A protein has these predicted regions:
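Flexible, solvent-exposed loop segments that connect beta-strands
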Residues: 1-7, 33-64, 91-110, 142-158
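Short glycine/proline- and aromatic-enriched beta-strand/turn motifs that initiate or cap beta-hairpins
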Residues: 1-23, 27-28, 165
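Exposed loop/turn and edge beta-strand positions of beta-sandwich/beta-sheet ligand-binding modules
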Residues: 12, 65, 81, 112-114, ...
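Membrane-embedded beta-strand positions of outer-membrane beta-barrel proteins
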Residues: 16-18, 30-32, 67-69, 83-89, ...
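Residue-level signature of outer-membrane beta-barrel architecture
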Residues: 20, 73-75, 120-124, 140, ...
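Repeated loop/turn-to-beta-strand initiation elements of outer-membrane beta-barrel proteins
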Residues: 25-28, 79-81, 125-130
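Outer-membrane beta-barrel "beta-signal"
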Residues: 68, 154-166
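Surface-exposed, polar helix/loop patches in the mature regions of secreted/periplasmic/lumenal proteins
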Residues: 70-103
Length: 166
C-alpha cells in the first residue's frame, strides 16, 4: 500500500509455518516467509550528487524475509473444517535494490514484523492427515531504507495464501 518504490502485484514468494497446540484451540509455532516485489521504471536522469547524475532505466526490487513466532486460535479444532485467527511476530530482513543495466545499487536493512491473518484449514478425511489451507493476511514491517533518490519507511503487504496442511 502507498509504496512507490515497488508497488506491483507479485506472486514471487513462499511461506512455511509449523506449530504445536498447547491447548486444544491455541497453537504456538514458528514461521519463515520470503517475498519479492518488482517494478520497471522508464529511462530517467537521477541526481547522485551536486556534480553528477545517472541516466538509465531501472528495475526496482524489494526482497523481504520475515521470520519469527506464530500464534493461532482455532475455532473448531475437532472438525475437518477449521477456521482460525492468528498473528505472526518477528524480525524482517529486506533488501531494496535498483538494477540499472549492469549496475546494482542496494540497501539491506532490518525491522520488526507483525502480520494478523484469518484462514481455514480443510482436511480431506476425518483423520486430518492432509488438507487444503487458505488464508488472508496483512503484514507490516518497520524496515527503512534509501537507494539513490528513493526511500522507504515501513513495508506493508496484503495477500492470500493457498497451500497444503499436514
Amino acid at each position: 500500500f502507498s509504496q512507490d518504490f515497488s508497488d506491483k502485484t507479485s506472486g514471487w514468494g513462499a511461506h512455511a509455518e509449523a506449530g504445536y497446540y498447547v491447548i486444544p484451540n491455541f497453537s504456538v509455532g514458528a514461521f519463515i516467509s520470503y517475498h519479492t516485489n518488482n517494478k520497471y521504471i522508464d529511462r530517467q536522469t537521477l541526481p547522485v550528487s551536486s556534480t553528477s547524475a545517472i541516466t538509465s532505466d531501472q528495475q526496482h526490487s524489494i526482497f523481504q524475509l520475515p521470520f519469527g513466532a506464530a500464534f493461532r486460535y482455532n475455532v473448531a479444532p475437532e472438525s475437518q473444517f477449521q477456521p482460525y485467527a492468528g498473528v505472526q511476530l518477528g524480525a524482517s530482513y529486506s533488501e531494496m535494490s535498483t538494477y540499472m543495466n549492469v549496475m546494482k545499487v542496494y540497501d539491506r536493512n532490518w525491522g520488526f514484523y507483525v502480520s494478523p491473518e484469518i484462514g481455514m484449514t480443510m482436511y480431506f478425511t476425518p483423520q486430518k492427515q492432509i488438507g487444503l489451507h487458505v488464508a488472508a493476511y496483512y503484514n507490516y514491517a518497520t524496515n527503512k531504507g534509501e537507494v539513490l533518490s528513493y526511500s522507504i519507511d515501513g513495508l506493508n503487504n496484503w495477500g492470500i495464501r493457498l497451500g497444503l496442511a499436514f
